[in-house]
């Protein structure tokens, strides 16, 4: 709470009420009611790179898809990483039932996001856009997996871990040529898609967005929308294809479902296994399904 009070002071906000937004898993997000009755959001990112990344992505996308307006920006001090003051968008996260009509719209907006080109494969940091080593997406994906091996080894059952290592080599080599580089959200899920009256009104949370291949961006949609209601898959794809071609989902989805779960195990280790136990178990279960192993230890 001291961080938000620090931000309120630095941005000289006249605030009536402060509410924590619990759905934010990485950064701290607060909903403020100002003295004039206006609702705004303050986002305090986990680190300074995420602060600049979110700011740059919102600025890039503001005339492309519905995103929050950046009302103010503070680059932080020795106590707080910094903060974004964001406008409120009318709507709520679409975590309830998603029908075919809404799924079509989500597909359209997701494709519009992917149509925005980036200077290369890479991401925004505090001092600009950092291009990946050799501007090579496949090298980046393989490098990430190598980096995650050691922390995953400490969490996963040894047999499951070994199966994961073998599984990666097989599915990685089968991937098609990446498309890109374009903006990928990296956390495109119902909680970050705002709707009102069954219409998409906003896309939020760009702190992990970067220049990548669109193939990485369908994992959460597959898990939390198509997996819950399979009837939403075709309308989504139809909506997406009104803007741009769809990648070969049959090839890329199994790989990225596995890759995303392996990454999430590392995230849980870094952020605390105990407090992220259910999320850890969800991802261990995904790994088990991917490689066909039902044993775990943690």
What does each model-identified segment do?
Residues 2-13, 115-186, 241, 276, ...:
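An alpha-helical support segment within catalytic cores of ATP-dependent transferases
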Residues 29-33, 42, 163-218:
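Active-site acidic catalytic loop and adjacent metal/ATP-binding pocket
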Residues 215-246, 258-274:
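Active-site activation/catalytic loop segments of kinase-like enzymes and analogous catalytic loops
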